[in-house]
C-alpha cells in the first residue's frame, strides 16, 4: 500500500526511528499510527535514530575462529561507555556480528555508503556489458542495471545482510534493537575476514620426486625413462648343455723293452701292465 509521507514524518518525530523504519512500520500496520509505534518498539527501533548521532568511542575488538580453523574474523564494534562495553548483551551482539561476517563470503564493507565510487562504477560497467542487455532499449537497460547494482552493493554490505539467526531482520536492524535496549549508540566500525590459503597459488607436487628427495635419491630424468621404456626386451638365451666334468687323468703305460724272441705279455684291459717286470719263456 502507498504510505503518505506526512505519516512517515509524524511517526519519525514521535519515535525517533529512521525514515525507512517508520515507512516499514506503517506498511506493516496498515497505516495505523499506534500499531506502527508498537511495531517499532517491539523491533527495538524506537529512539535508535536519535542515539545514532552520538559519538561512540568505547567498545571491544573481538575475534571468531570458525570450526576447523580455516576461517577467522576480527571485528571492532563501538559504544559510548565502557560500562556498556562490559555488558553481556553487548558482548553477545559483537560475537553474533563476527559469526555473521564469517558466514558471508561476499561481504567486504560495513555499509553501502563505505563502498568506494570506483567499485560502484566497475560493477556498473560489468552489468552494462552483459549480453542479455544488448538488445534492450537504453532506458530499459539503465533501469535493469540500476536494480542489479543495488542488489550487488547489498551483497557487499554487512549491514544489509539478513541476520543468520533470524532472517526476518537485517544486521542493521539487529544493531538498532541493541541501541534501543542498551540506551547507547552502537556502531560497527571495521572488520577483517581471513580464509586459510586465500590468494596463494598452489603448485602441483611431483609425488615421485618428493619421495625420492626424502630418500636422498635422484629422481630419474624423463629422457632416461623414455629411453629405457623404448628399449626392446632382451632376447632369451638358448639353454647351453652343461659342461662335462674333466676326465680323470690316467698315467701312461710304461714302455717295456723286450728281447726279439720274447712274446709280449698280454695286458689286462683297462689296466696298465706292471712296471718293469718281463718274463722269458723257457
UniProtKB/Swiss-Prot annotation:
Main location, first listed in the record: cytoplasm
Gene Ontology MF terms: translation elongation factor activity
Segments of skewed composition (Basic residues): 273-282
ATP-binding is among the record's keywords: no
Key words of the record: Cytoplasm, Elongation factor, Protein biosynthesis
Region Disordered, annotated ranges: 218-282
PROSITE patterns attached to this UniProt entry: EF_TS_1, EF_TS_2
Protein's UniProt keywords contain Protein biosynthesis: yes
Subcellular localization, as worded in the UniProt entry: Cytoplasm
Parts forming coiled coils: none
NCBIfam families xref list: tsf (TIGR00116)
The protein's role, per its UniProt record: Associates with the EF-Tu.GDP complex and induces the exchange of GDP to GTP. It remains bound to the aminoacyl-tRNA.EF-Tu.GTP complex up to the GTP hydrolysis stage on the ribosome.
Similarity comment: Belongs to the EF-Ts family.
Protein name, per record: Elongation factor Ts
